[in-house]
């Protein structure tokens, strides 16, 4: 979904990861090729299944989700990637084993964003910006989050510990919270949506934010537009992407 959003926004995209040599893996490769998203760093592995998510809806609202998956064990990419060839690297950690081993080694001038799931210190120490939701921030910081101040304290702890530039905390109906060095804190007000379907909202935030921050270097502007884009997406059923026309309407 991140790759589809980036491509829809006009970015040239290359995917890296591991999927199964199966029906759904072949389907994924076909979809990505159709969208002109490079798959040269996607490994199709025998005896591994491609993750499949089945969502159960009732009255246009998601009630549950069934995941068919297998966790990779100590996977590393077969082909070395020169990350400096890319303007931006986004790491989407779904905790399926892709990042269980330390193989990602960016150079000091790379722009890297992590959408985290669990605490992986080797990843946190390799990135500039992370985009956790409240539950993920609580896990990463090992702190209970029950107020704005507790959220800020947890984020500031991670900023110092891993030398991060910024943390964008996605808070659903409460909007975004941008936290940076030197006690920088900025609240991004929510855009209320009636009966939202939050599927893919985090993917939209990281995609739109990354695209804009890469071109403007304006953290607040980029986060504000990303927040508006997420509101548009959650107003629809299931996953959807934003495109350049959508982006213009948010500016």
Give residue ranges: language-model regions.
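Hydrophobic residues at beta-strand termini and immediately following loops
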Residues: 66, 187-188
């Amino acid at each position: 979904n991140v790759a589809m959003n980036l491509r829809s926004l006009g970015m040239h995209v290359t995917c890296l990861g591991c999927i199964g040599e199966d029906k759904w893996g072949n389907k994924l490769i076909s979809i990505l090729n159709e969208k002109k998203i490079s798959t040269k760093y996607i490994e199709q592995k025998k005896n591994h299944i491609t993750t499949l998510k089945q969502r159960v809806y009732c009255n246009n609202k998601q009630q549950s989700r069934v995941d068919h998956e297998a966790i990779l064990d100590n996977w590393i990419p077969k082909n070395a990637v020169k990350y400096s060839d890319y303007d931006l690297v986004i790491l989407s950690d779904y905790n399926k084993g892709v990042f269980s081993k330390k193989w990602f080694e960016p150079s000091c001038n790379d722009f890297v964003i992590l959408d985290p799931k669990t605490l992986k210190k080797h990843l946190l120490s390799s990135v500039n910006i992370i985009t956790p939701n409240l539950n993920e921030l609580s896990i990463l910081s090992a702190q209970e989050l029950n107020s704005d101040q507790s959220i800020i304290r947890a984020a500031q702890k991670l900023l110092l510990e891993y030398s991060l530039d910024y943390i964008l905390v996605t808070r659903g109906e409460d909007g975004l919270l941008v936290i940076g060095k030197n006690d920088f804190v900025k609240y991004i007000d929510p855009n209320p949506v009636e009966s939202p379907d939050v599927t893919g909202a985090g993917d939209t935030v990281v995609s739109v934010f990354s695209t804009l921050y890469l071109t403007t270097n304006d953290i607040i502007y980029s986060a504000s537009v990303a927040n508006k884009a997420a509101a548009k997406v959650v107003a629809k059923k299931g996953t959807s992407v934003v495109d350049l026309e959508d982006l213009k309407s948010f500016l």
